[in-house]
Amino acid sequence: MRYLVTGATGFIGRRMLRHLTDGGHDVTALVRAIPALPGVRTAYGDLATGAGLLAAVQGVDRVIHLAGVTKAPSHHLYDRVNAEGTRRLCAALAALPEPPRLVHCSSLAAAGPGRQRREEEEPAPVSAYGRSKLGGEHALREVAHRVPGVIVRPPIVYGPGDREFLPRLVTAVRTGLLPAIGRRGPRHYSLIHVDDLCQALLTAADSGAPGAIYHVSDGTEHLWADIGAAVAAVLGRRAPRVVHIPGGVAVAAARVFGRGSVLNPDKVAEALHPAWTSAPGRLPFTPEITLPEGLRAALTA
């Protein structure tokens, strides 16, 4: 099978390349520069401008769309990449005589917060990031009459190569304090290991129904305190104490630090909600990596 992967140099993208090459597939990575990506071809394409996209999508059977930004200085940049970039890719695919199947890696942020969120529920994103990812989903629907597209919404993704979620947790464990923004009480999150996500995306590529949205996770609602304790167990430290930060304080601090920082208005808008979990989805996919297993592999490698 011939695959084109966008976002191939990112955290999820590099793992996806490994899964595809290990599976014996013919893989092309869409890039703006030409990095060293062993075992795959590269094709120039710029989602921000559309340059090179039509040539890059020629002759492929599947497109795995992973490109996107998770932190940006303004909502315009989120939209430019996550929504408009996806729209440009969709337009290039729709221009082909026989468009390939497209799997779009969206986010649970596009659905919005809550416990056991289901695919059929009305989306209610609370951040610029979530709204931009929902915009990318709309781009797929605009070409659904031409392009057989499938949307996958993962929650928090972790694993080897993660430079955002796990490093922050490790820092929290080492300080002994695990911040929780907003009102007191339990906080629930869905997670998925990057390798399980790759398998879910490939399952969607093979057997997902065109036009469908699929929520994927490791199948467990994790308490925030338990996540911190699991990281501590791998590091041989005491479980960190959950420290609640009032929402007003966090919002004020985020305005000072700005959108480009770890503590930014977008992240605070999401963190104020005590639950981000999804119900077991309709995709015929079974996660294999538990949180303790995934953390052990990622943090002791």
Please state what every model-predicted region is.
Residues 3-23:
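N-terminal Rossmann NAD(P)H-binding glycine-rich loop of SDR-like oxidoreductase domains
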Residues 44-87, 108-113:
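NAD(P)H-binding glycine-rich loop region in Rossmannoid oxidoreductase-like domains
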Residues 87-128:
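Conserved Rossmann-fold NAD(P)-dependent oxidoreductase catalytic core, especially the SDR/UDP-sugar
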Residues 124-150:
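Active-site Tyr-X1-5-Lys
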Residues 163-168, 182-205, 211-212:
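Substrate-positioning beta->alpha
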Residues 203-262, 291-299:
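Mid/C-terminal beta-alpha module of Rossmann-like enzyme folds, strongest
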Residues 247-286:
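A hydrophobic C-terminal alpha-helical subdomain
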Residues 277-301:
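Amphipathic terminal alpha-helices
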